[in-house]
């Protein structure tokens, strides 16, 4: 099972690095808000040049674990038109 992702955890970088910027107001993983399907990452640059700035939400989350009615975000989940989640908790995991 993939690890749960949280605010501050990294996404796979492409033109510049980015981290999870949004999460649940009341569900926490290791005392950090759990980032869910639809929650954005920090603003970052996307190729090709001139690398326009944008932010993107988690496109897919868990289909069996829900956080405030949204799929819980996990390492490997896709980020809309962008990349994927790269980092998460070392000891909290969420199913498919």
Kindly label every feature range from the protein language model.
Residues 2-96:
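Intrinsically disordered, low-complexity proline/glycine-rich segments
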């Amino acid at each position: 099972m993939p690890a749960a992702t949280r605010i501050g955890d990294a996404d796979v970088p492409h033109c510049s690095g980015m981290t999870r910027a949004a999460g649940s107001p009341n569900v926490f993983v290791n005392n950090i808000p759990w980032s869910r399907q639809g929650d954005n990452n920090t603003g970052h640059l996307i190729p090709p040049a001139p690398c326009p700035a944008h932010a993107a939400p988690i496109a897919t989350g868990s289909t069996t674990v829900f956080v405030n009615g949204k799929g819980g975000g996990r390492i490997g989940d896709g980020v809309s038109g962008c990349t994927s989640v790269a980092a998460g908790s070392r000891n909290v995991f969420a199913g498919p």
